[in-house]
Amino acid sequence: MKLSIIIIATSLVIAVVAFPSKDSKAIENDKTEQRMEIVVQETARACSKQIGDKCKRNCECCRKTVVCGTIYVGGKEVNQCMDKTSDNAILNGLGKGMNFIENTFSFCV
């Protein structure tokens, strides 16, 4: 009796693992579409905005460590060019390094 319960339980576990649900496929397709949209949105443009100006993309912001970041003013989302990431000097330096890497892979002209 115990052997049959173990065999049935093992079979159910194998079935669950072997046959993924349709929902996981849908989520994977959504991720692929999102990646494709990001690539299309990040088109090459010359920089035209300075720190504090409103922006839509990283390529619009001038300087190597400046990115188009999001802040919230009065509960509204505002995108603007910024390079400061923290009041802590060490964390700010690391943040600027990350901004530099992000801009390197933006392929801006």
UniProtKB/Swiss-Prot annotation:
Keywords: Disulfide bond, Ion channel impairing toxin, Knottin, Secreted, Signal, Toxin. The keyword Signal applies. Residues 1-18 form the signal peptide. GO terms for molecular function: ion channel regulator activity; toxin activity. It comes from the Eukaryota. It is found in: Secreted. Disulfide bonds join C47-C62, C55-C68, C59-C108, C61-C81. One of its GO terms (cellular component) is extracellular region. Expressed by the venom gland. Residues 19-46 form a propeptide. The presence of a 'disulfide through disulfide knot' structurally defines this protein as a knottin. Putative ion channel inhibitor. Belongs to the neurotoxin 25 family. F7 subfamily. This is Hainantoxin-XVIII-3. It comes from Cyriopagopus hainanus (Chinese bird spider).
